[in-house]
Structures are given as C-alpha cells and as structure tokens.
C-alpha cells in the first residue's frame, strides 16, 4: 500500500505495483506522503483528491485526512473510496501514547490551529502551530533534511513534553483535532461504525 497526495503520485504507485493507494488529503495530520514534485505543491483537499484518484487508477483507494467520525467515513465512501484511514481520530484515545499536553492541545484546537512545516523533522508535516515553529520559520535558516533534523530536535521536544512546555513541543495533528474523542479504542471503533451506518442510511433516505 502506498500513499499519494496527487493523482500523479497515485499513477506512479500503480505503475510500481502496489495493491492499494491511500489518497492523503491536505487535512491529514502527521508527515505528508508526497514524493513527486517540490514540497508544498501537493496540498489537495480530500474531497477534491479522492474522486480524481479513483478515476485515475484501477486500484482500491483508501481515503485519509480530516476524517474524524461516521459522517467523514460516509462522505469518503460516497466519493468512491473503498476504505478509510484515520489517525487524529485516535489521538486522545486511552491507548494513544501522545503526552497529556499533546492530547489536551489537539482536543482544544481550532480548525486553523495547525500548519504544515518541515522545521521540526526536515520533512513536511501537519502539526499544531507553536512559538517554536513560528520562530524557526521566521529565522530563514536552512533546515537539514529528514532524518538528521528530526534527530537534532527530538531531544528538545521530548524534554519539553516532560516539563509540560507545549510552546517547544512538536504535536502532530490533523485539521479536525477538536472532533477527537477520548475513551478506549474499541469503543471509538464501535462508535465510528454506528455513525457511518447511520450517515449512509440518511444519505439513502
């Protein structure tokens, strides 16, 4: 399974022989799966990306990015996806290894609280904007590539998490972090299934 952020990348993955393609919309938290073209070019939203990838490749398409509940799952399936991939939806779950500060910031974040930056790891990633990210971006300094930059900054982020210094932390999150719900992963999965079924029934009514 490969990740594509554009139809061009999806076609390249199909040519390489993958079994399925994850269509990663720009809303997705974490590192971008882009691998063709200059950084920052492939910021296509999920609603625009999924149907174009579905039409471009003869492979199962898995939608990822900003899907947080059953409504998002139903929408992705309506766009032609055969499955979904959720990450931020489980960020505040009981099993999540994110720090309490990270969970709190993500759950309380506004829809414009994240940014895509390479300053912390050397690779574009969507994370909660912090004073550290702002300062690094304003500095104009050249950022080493991944993974050296990640190795250089990780000790700072880990120490900041231990001291509850969120202004110095690197907190990955999608654009809909406020929709993340706490609890055991089992219960979250069951709720997602119920919500998706209900949303699909509403669409079919």
Language-model features and meaning:
Residues 1-3, 24, 62-64:
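A cross-family glycoside hydrolase active-site/sugar-binding cleft signature
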Residues 7-10, 18, 50, 73:
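Generic hydrophobic/aromatic pocket-lining and core-packing "Φ" positions
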Residues 1-12, 67:
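Active-site glycine- and acidic-residue-rich loops that bind
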Residues 5-6, 25-27, 89:
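Short, ordered loop/turn segments at secondary-structure junctions
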Residues 10-26:
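A structural preference for short, pocket-lining loop segments at secondary-structure junctions
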Residues 31-62, 67-205:
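Conserved active-site-proximal phosphate/metal-binding subdomains
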């Amino acid at each position: 399974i490969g990740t594509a952020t554009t139809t061009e990348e999806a076609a390249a993955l199909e040519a390489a022989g993958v079994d399925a393609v994850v269509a990663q919309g720009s809303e997705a938290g974490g590192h971008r799966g882009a691998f063709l073209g200059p950084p920052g070019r492939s910021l296509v939203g999920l609603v625009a990306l999924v149907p174009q990838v579905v039409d471009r490749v003869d492979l199962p398409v898995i939608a990822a990015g900003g899907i947080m509940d059953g409504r998002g799952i139903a929408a992705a399936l309506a766009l032609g996806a055969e499955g979904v991939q959720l990450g931020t939806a489980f960020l505040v779950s009981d099993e999540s290894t994110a720090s309490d500060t990270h969970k709190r910031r993500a759950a309380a974040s506004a829809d414009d609280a994240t940014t895509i930056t390479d300053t912390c790891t050397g690779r574009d990633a969507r994370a909660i904007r912090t004073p550290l990210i702002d300062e690094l971006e304003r500095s104009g300094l050249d950022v080493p590539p991944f993974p050296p930059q990640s190795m250089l900054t990780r000790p700072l982020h880990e120490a900041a998490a231990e001291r509850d210094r969120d202004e110095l932390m690197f907190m990955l999150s999608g654009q809909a972090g406020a929709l993340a719900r706490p609890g055991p992963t089992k219960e979250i999965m069951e709720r997602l299934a119920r919500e998706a079924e209900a949303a699909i029934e509403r669409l079919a009514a």
